[in-house]
Amino acid sequence: IFRNNQPSHAVPGGSTFNTLISLGRLGVPATFISEIGKDTVGDIIIDFMKKNGVCTENLDIFCEGKTPISLAFLDENNEARYMFYNQFPEERLNFVWPRIEKDDIIIFGSYFALNPALRKKVCELVEFAKERKAIIYYDPNFRDAHAHEAVKLMPSVLENLEYADLVKGSADDFNNLFHVTDPQKIYTDHIKFYCPNFICTLGSKGVKLFCEKGDKHFATTPVTPVSTIGAGDSFN
């Protein structure tokens, strides 16, 4: 994390990762499925997960390549701009499948759920979870860094929406995907056909919930943020 273009501190993170860490701290059984390099950064992340009660048994720990790193640059309003660096092996996401039961919750999203190199295995896992009658929660978390790929990735985005029992995303996510920020238009034009349950977060303007029975707006309490990193993940 950088403030005034100077490194401030480094911590493990990522959208779904942050959500599971919060659940682990609350004592909720949580398993993280992803890929991590067999290196110092990877060791730090695994140790952090264990200390926060998140299961690491289903990680793919690879030897050829390096654990990915994200840089977050905070502006004067503590809003974050991101840059990503990675070096993955040719063969990806060779994880041990977890036990999935009815009403378990599967959270998936971000570019990880759209990446062509991982797409087949992500779909296999989500389809298996649906067969087991798990609840599928999709958080697009579609950042500015991938906005130029929106058209190319759209078939996978729409397929993810169709998988989902609940879609949650920020107005910024959907602006990057569909060039729309109005929650009603996002739901009516882009979400409802695929998934009836939708939550749109609007930062300081609150949260809008849509479902088959109607919609409702929830106001937020004004705060001065320390930073916006992981705000949506905390909402999850």
Residue ranges and their predicted role:
Residues 1-55, 224-226:
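Glycine-rich phosphate/adenosyl-contacting loop at the front of the ribokinase-like
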Residues 30, 56, 134-136, 198, ...:
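Hydrophobic anchor at the start of a short beta-strand
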Residues 4, 83, 104, 177, ...:
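Residues that scaffold the ATP/ADP-binding catalytic core of kinase and kinase-like folds
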Residues 29-110:
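Conserved N-terminal subdomain of the carbohydrate kinase-like
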Residues 23, 170, 232:
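Short, conserved phosphate/pyrophosphate- and ester-handling motifs at nucleotide-, phospho-/glycolipid
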Residues 99-101, 160-161, 192:
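A short, aliphatic-rich alpha-helical micro-motif
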Residues 127, 183-236:
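Conserved phosphate-binding/catalytic region of the ribokinase-like
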Residues 111-188, 196, 206-207:
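Conserved beta-alpha-beta core of the PfkB/ribokinase-like small-molecule kinase fold
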